[in-house]
Amino acid sequence: MAEFWTSYLWPLLVVIGQSLLLLILLLITIAYILLADRKIWAAVQIRRGPNVVGPWGLLQSFADLLKFVFKEPMIPSGANKGVFLLAPLVSCVLALAAWAVIPVNAGWVIADINVGVLYILAVSSLSVYGIIMAGWSSNSKYPFLAALRSAAQMVSYEVSIGFVIIAVLLCVGSLNLTAIVEAQNTKWGLLGWYWLPLFPVFVIFYVSALAETNRPPFDLVEAESELVAGFMVEYASTPYLLFMLGEYVAITTMCAMGAILFLGGWLPPVPYAPFTWVPGIIWFMLKGFFMFFLFAMAKAIVPRYRYDQLMRLGWKVFLPLSLVMVVIVAGVLQFAGLAPQ
């Protein structure tokens, strides 16, 4: 019995506890990221934004949560009820699953697997199924059209993100997220992070992440002027909330990936005191919020692309450009003798 406790039950309880703690912290982070998104958008438009609920509007997201929970969920008469209700759950759970392998500090990760980047790419690819299920089961033309757009859009830009990962892999020699951060730990500080030598790759990743998460200017899936609310037209109450939660969790995942792949993860920008006194998780959060600020500014200042422009950018610009960058990075590493052994 003692062996069963120490070998199986206790490790299982530890993982469950870590997962619940991560979930709670992630949900609180999402609440304030959503508020920051609205505040940034308001500032660009010279408005005040949410400022009534709580001091400076800090409790606005929790008020919105209560509003959604107490609304009545509606199911269209011709909808496939099972698939209709399962779709938001699939979208949300798959978005949350990606955080199992993301290290927020040295050793602070639930599963430190050697293929962490591929795991995140695979899980984010599966999240499109939730949108397709919602579009098909709603028995409405607008959600169905949005689901078709989403499938094409996510497949198109996952290719570019895949080549971005290959470029970073060539520099590091590992798909382990912790190893990628440690490879950027040099005496040069932020000048040794991959955003500088791989700047074109960083730009490709940033724009592809916008498209992958259906953020403006690539929000063709839920284009208000064309498709009302896209695949979420027929949803209300908690199912709608789950879709929103899945969307913002996916955004935080991409922000965390950008911080790890290009901004040194939890490493300080200057590897000397007093910067080294700051806990690594604080640096990780600051870099994640910087990436989200770039996401929010794109929403505030860039007009929406047409669908044909979106596809053209993905297949005719980013795909060949990312492939060329992979070849250039591989060539430079080989001829300069910098390739990882």
Curated annotation (Swiss-Prot):
It is found in: Cell inner membrane. It catalyses: a quinone + NADH + 5 H(+)(in) = a quinol + NAD(+) + 4 H(+)(out). It is an enzyme of class 7 (translocase). NCBIfam families: PRK06076.1-2, PRK06076.1-6. Its EC number is 7.1.1.-. This is NADH-quinone oxidoreductase subunit H 1. It comes from the Bacteria. Its main location: membrane. InterPro entries: NADH_UbQ_OxRdtase_su1/FPO, NADH_UbQ_OxRdtase_su1_CS.
